[in-house]
């Protein structure tokens, strides 16, 4: 077995080197963006490191805000400035509206039948419309206030118990579980935590993001696809798909058995109703339902949890900001112990804190890649159809040319005089993307994050447990991968205010 692997490696390397030198003989006349030096066969894949957004930001600092890399033989355009992002997501948005679908993304999205990876077109518009109408609209967000209050109240009770016993809590885990339970009620009709056959949201989300990340060699070099079997990444992807598929199958079966008895249909009920309607504009089969539910449930859970976790991290690192926020919340919300969604609308410093957290810690620092559908001229360079485009929101939102010399610092006050919001109108601030592919779940996520943070800050004072030794700022260390969750959980001591 080992000999066969060695022979395969040698043959593959020999053939790819031949192809590499053959490509050197070609002298294209195209005017291409600057590129760093790359290796044969793998191109620039080796330069991504454990934190691709940071690695690409460093490369862009040397080669410019519009940079062309090769992932294997696949051309990938890296955008690291607001000016170029404007051209991609507004001026030429339609040409850049498609998605590249890697092997892992194809499997997880049922061949692009979800919302994130679906090709731009009628099906994508229909899915986006039904998700917005039945889950993500302002009307639906407001109607889920009671469900949010129930779960946030349970979290407050858990923290109160810890306060009385002077115990520490893993706030990262508590927040993830709470958001998962809220989304369970909103998307699935009930929370499934504690039931047999449920999933570990944080673990499966991390595995999902790793599976559709940038690093798998086989995704970009088909001749080396067999490496996934040896490293186990193919098996991990199969396990993720089956695990979540089985869970959603259980959810669908429960809904098929009980839909007729419900007074208020949930999101899954609405999808099943649409599926049964042969005259519906959007025809969906069960596999389509599974990937749409997967996306709405996990997507909202992971992004919202990360925002709250980073917000608490930053506030405890900056006690003067925490004090300002506590004063505002306790001044606006005096009558009730619970801070409602209506009350947070009048909290300007809270809004600034959320904006600053999303500036420093966008949920996906590298926006979901786009695919160019036809040739285009971009900043004087010739970009050919089939080129993938990655926009480094993390780099754009820490650009000192835009944000000043303190761009790396947490300073909510910088947002007081700005009219910037989350919906991509200003390309210097794009935590959820912009243009046609703007994330449609902004309203739901921002309300959950704001209300949860307001209640955490109002009800308790906080002391953070010392992090592991060996790190300069352990609480700010990012985990590996394409998301930016904390490497270490946020362990804190709450005390009733």
Curated annotation (Swiss-Prot):
Function: Possesses triterpene oxidizing activity. Catalyzes the C23 hydroxylation of marneral to form 23-hydroxymarneral. Catalyzes the C23 hydroxylation of marnerol to form 23-hydroxymarnerol.
TM annotation in the entry: 1-21
Record has Iron as a keyword: yes
PROSITE patterns assigned: CYTOCHROME_P450
Main location per the UniProt record: membrane
Top EC class, one word: oxidoreductase
Record keywords: Heme, Iron, Membrane, Metal-binding, Monooxygenase, Oxidoreductase, Transmembrane, Transmembrane helix
PANTHER family with a match to the protein in the record: CYTOCHROME P450 71A2-LIKE (PTHR47955:SF15), CYTOCHROME P450 FAMILY 71 PROTEIN (PTHR47955)
GO MF, any single term: monooxygenase activity
Species this protein is from: Arabidopsis thaliana
Cofactor: heme
UniProt xrefs under Pfam families: p450
Membrane disposition: Single-pass membrane protein
UniProt EC number: 1.14.-.-
GO biological process: triterpenoid metabolic process
Originating gene: CYP71A16
Entry's family note: Belongs to the cytochrome P450 family.
Locations listed in the record: Membrane
Protein name (record): Cytochrome P450 71A16
Source domain of life: Eukaryota
GO cellular component term, pick one: endoplasmic reticulum
Binding site for heme: 439
């Amino acid at each position: 077995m080992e000999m066969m692997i060695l022979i395969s490696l040698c043959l593959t390397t020999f053939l790819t080197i031949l192809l590499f030198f053959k490509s050197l003989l070609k002298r294209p006349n195209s005017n291409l963006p600057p590129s760093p030096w790359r290796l044969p066969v793998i191109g620039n894949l080796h330069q991504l490191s454990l934190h691709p957004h940071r690695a690409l930001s460093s490369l862009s600092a040397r080669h410019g805000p519009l940079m062309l890399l090769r992932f294997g033989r696949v051309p990938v355009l890296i955008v690291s400035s607001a000016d170029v992002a404007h051209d991609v997501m507004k001026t030429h948005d339609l040409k850049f509206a498609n998605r590249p679908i890697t092997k892992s993304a194809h499997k997880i999205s049922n061949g692009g039948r979800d919302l994130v990876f679906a090709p731009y077109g009628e099906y994508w518009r229909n899915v986006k419309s039904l998700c917005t109408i039945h889950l993500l609209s302002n009307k639906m967000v407001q109607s889920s206030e009671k469900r949010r209050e129930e779960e946030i109240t349970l979290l407050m009770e858990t923290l109160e118990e810890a306060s009385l016993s002077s115990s520490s809590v893993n706030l990262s885990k508590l927040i993830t579980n709470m958001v998962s339970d809220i989304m369970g009620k909103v998307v699935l009709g009930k929370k499934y935590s504690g039931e047999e056959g449920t999933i570990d949201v944080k673990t499966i989300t991390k595995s999902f993001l790793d599976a559709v990340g940038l690093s798998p060699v086989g995704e970009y070099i088909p001749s080396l696809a067999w490496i996934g079997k040896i490293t186990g990444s193919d098996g991990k992807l199969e396990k993720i798909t089956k695990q979540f598929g089985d869970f959603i199958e259980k959810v669908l079966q429960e809904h098929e058995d009980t839909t007729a008895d419900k007074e208020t249909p949930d999101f899954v009920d609405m999808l099943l109703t649409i599926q049964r309607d042969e005259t519906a504009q959007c025809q969906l089969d069960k596999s389509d339902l599974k990937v749409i539910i997967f996306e709405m449930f996990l997507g909202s859970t992971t992004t919202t949890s990360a925002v709250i976790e980073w917000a608490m991290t930053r506030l405890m690192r900056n006690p003067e900001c925490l004090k300002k926020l506590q004063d505002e919340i306790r001044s606006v919300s005096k009558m009730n112990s619970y801070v409602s969604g209506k009350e947070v609308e009048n909290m300007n410093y809270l809004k600034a804190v959320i904006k600053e957290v999303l500036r420093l810690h966008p949920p996906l620092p590298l926006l979901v890649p786009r695919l160019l559908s036809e040739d285009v001229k971009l900043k004087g360079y010739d970009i050919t159809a089939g080129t993938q485009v990655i926009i480094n929101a993390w780099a754009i939102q820490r650009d000192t040319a835009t944000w000043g010399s303190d761009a790396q610092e947490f300073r909510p006050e910088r947002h007081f005089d700005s009219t910037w919001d989350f919906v991509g109108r200003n390309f210097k601030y794009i935590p959820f993307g912009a243009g046609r592919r703007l994330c449609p779940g902004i309203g739901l996520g921002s309300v959950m994050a704001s209300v949860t943070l307001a209640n955490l800050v109002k009800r308790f004072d906080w002391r953070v447990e010392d992090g592991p030794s060996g790190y300069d700022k352990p609480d700010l260390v990012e985990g590996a991968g394409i998301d930016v969750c904390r490497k270490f959980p946020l362990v804190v001591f709450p005390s009733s205010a």
